[in-house]
């Protein structure tokens, strides 16, 4: 009966819409600079493919180092302070991108963006799970990820449009304004009453162990995203498409469709099965892009890739949250999302090196290989969970057979 009551608890409330709206403005800001940074490095600063990979990926270096800390802070002091401070730091740092036409200066500003990104994402994503009934948590994560991937998908279209009309300086201003809007919306959010954390021996680790396995799979699967966002804006010139607008519009539209109409998929199939579907679709999409070097190949590959990217994050986060106490949600999100940062930071460097030696299609192929490797990670994670379950059941039997005096 309790389960029925929780399921009837409304999810799409004004409070939920406010935090998702803040997230969309924020990720639209990040998405706006996605096509601008590679082109700015290559055409204005004279950098090569490795420099592009570093400039794109270094944002996530600061984020990956900070996320576990801010996850613990969010569990102790609340989510709103992370949301507001993170978005504010991002707004200021993006405005600095064009202050000095220097690659080292840009890299420094990108690291600062990463620090703000870590705080905002952990605060907002954790508040989303705070607001959701347990049985609808996968659905809530899916709606939240509409904001994440919708912003990252449609932001590049806005960025390309602004570059064509007003140049790089205008892109930094537009992105900074969107991040500032996210901070304002975040200011009007309210904290959710949460279970009180109880100190348990062995649970004071910086990295939350429940999130490490699913996070490692996320890392492997999302290196494809690093290849897609870094090199599609440059690859379109090679195949005569001219602009990446249509590719990012296709990607964004499909992400929205899957996330909205397939929001219950992770809850229905479970995190592991949904993760398998996501990895399979991602692998197929990146393989098509790598082997079919035409406009049609890029568009067909994008369809499969978008479907996979839509499901991967909510499926694996649901898996991670199911392994941890309710009092550790912030810590789980912080640790889990660190692997997202790692995939985009280290992943951008990896695909940048591959692109320097094997071209942009080689970078897409690397994304396919890493996504396929995610199946191994899921299998290992499932095996370990079964082993722990068996050991727990055996201990329970022993305790029953030999009760304490």
List the predicted regions and their residue ranges.
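Paired small-residue
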Residues: 93, 104-112, 296-304
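Cytoplasmic helix-loop-helix junction between adjacent transmembrane helices
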Residues: 109-148
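Structural signature of the two symmetry-related core transmembrane helices
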Residues: 81-95, 176, 273-288
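Helix-to-loop junctions at the C-terminal end of transmembrane segments
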Residues: 66-78, 258-271
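Residue-level signature of mid-helix packing/kink "hotspots" within the transmembrane helices
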Residues: 60-68, 152-153, 255-260, 344-345
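C-terminal membrane-cytosol helix-exit motif in multi-pass small-molecule transporters
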Residues: 176-195, 377-382
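Conserved MFS/SLC helix-loop-helix module at the cytosolic interface between two early adjacent transmembrane helices
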Residues: 65-101
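Helix-breaking motifs and short loop linkers at transmembrane-helix boundaries and internal kinks
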Residues: 46, 78, 99-104, 270, ...
